[in-house]
C-alpha cells in the first residue's frame, strides 16, 4: 500500500479513478504520495470509483491525492483528458483537453481540478479571476498557477485571501492570511524560506513575528532547506526581540495583580510605577512654571499689542510727511533741471558767438548777440528786484524793532498817536518801552561783564602756567 511493488498482471482501479496495472517488464513502484509511475502495463484496466475512464497503458499505481500518472482519464465533472487530475487540481505534464471548473470558469489548461483550477495555462480563481503566473509544484514537478479565494493575481502561490507572493521558489503551502512560508502556521508565520509575507493589514516585517506583528531579527534555520524565514504579524508592528510580547503580557499581568486601591500611597507602590508618577509630577510642575511665566509676561505682551495701533498711526503719519517731502524735492529737482537746461543752452549760444568772434573774417549777426544780452539783462533785473524787496522788508523790520525799543521822539506821527491815547495808556506804553530798554541794556552789560571775566580768567590761566613752569 505504501510503496510495495505489485506483480499481478491485472491492473486494478485506484481509489479515485486512477488506473493501475502490473508491468511485464518493469517493477511497479507501488502506492506513494507523489511518486511517478513509469512502468508499462499491458492488461486491461478497470474504472475508478468516480467514473474515471482509464485508457491505454499506465505506468503503475498512481498517487491517491493527485500525483502524476501516465494514463488517460476523465474527471468527475465531465472534463475529458488524457491524463488524470488530482483531487485539488494538480496537473500532470501530459496534454489534455479543456475542462470546466466547478463554477463554470473556462480554462485552457490540460485538465480541470475539483475547484476549476487550470494547470499550465491561465487559471481562474474562485470568482473567475485570471491567474497567468506559473510556479513549480514540489510534489508533481509541473508548472501551474493557482488563484486566491477572492481572485487576486499572484506571481506565485497565493493564500486563502489572494495575497500575492513573488517568490520564484517551488510552490509551497499558504497561510490562512496570505503569508507564504515553506511551512506556515495558522497566521502565516514562515518556517524556513526566504519569502517575505505581508501581515494581515499589509505591513512588511523583517523577520518572524508574533501574533500581533512583533518582528524580530533572529534567524531560524530549517533542517530541510536552511533558508532564512520572514513573515508578517497580525498588525504589522516590528520589534527587535521575540520575547517582547510575552514581557508586555507579563507586565500587564503583574500590574493587574498589584493590590492598588484609591487609598494606596505612592510610597507603597513598586519603584517603577513610583518613578513614572514622579516623572509625571515633574512634567506637570514644569508646565505650571511655564504657565506662571507666561502669565507674568501677559502685561508686557498686552502693552505691546496695545501699542500696535499707535505705531501704525505714527508710521502712517511719517509716510504721509515723507511723501510730501519727496513731492517737494521732486519739484525743486525739476526747477533745478530747468535752470540747468537754460544755462546749458546759454552756454552753447555763448560758445558759438565766441567762436565767431575769434574766427577772422567771419560775420557776426547782431540779432543773436542782442537777444542773448537782452535775456540776461531781464534775468538780472528780476534778481535785483527780488533783492531790493528783501532788503526793504529787513529794513522795515529793523525800524519797527528800534521804534518799539527806543521810541522815535523826532517822529511827528508817533507824537500824534501818543496825544490821541489816554494818559494811562501812554504811561503803560512808556513803561513797556522803558522795561524793554532796561532788559536790553542789562543784557548788554551782562555780556560786557562776561567778556571781562573771560579776559581775567585767561590772564590768571597764563600766570598759573608760568608759575608751574618756574616751579619745575
UniProtKB/Swiss-Prot annotation:
Record remark: domains: Contains FG repeats. FG repeats are interaction sites for karyopherins (importins, exportins) and form probably an affinity gradient, guiding the transport proteins unidirectionally with their cargo through the NPC. FG repeat regions are highly flexible and lack ordered secondary structure. The overall conservation of FG repeats regarding exact sequence, spacing, and repeat unit length is limited.
Name of this chain's protein: Nucleoporin NUP49/NSP49
Gene Ontology process terms (BP): amyloid fibril formation; nucleocytoplasmic transport; poly(A)+ mRNA export from nucleus; post-transcriptional tethering of RNA polymerase II gene DNA at nuclear periphery; protein import into nucleus; ribosomal large subunit export from nucleus; RNA export from nucleus; telomere tethering at nuclear periphery
GO cellular component, one term: nuclear envelope
Membrane topology designation: Peripheral membrane protein
Bias (Low complexity): 64-80, 214-226
Signal sequence region: none
Coiled coil: none
Region of interest (Disordered), ranges: 28-104, 211-242
Lineage: Eukaryota, Fungi, Dikarya, Ascomycota, Saccharomycotina
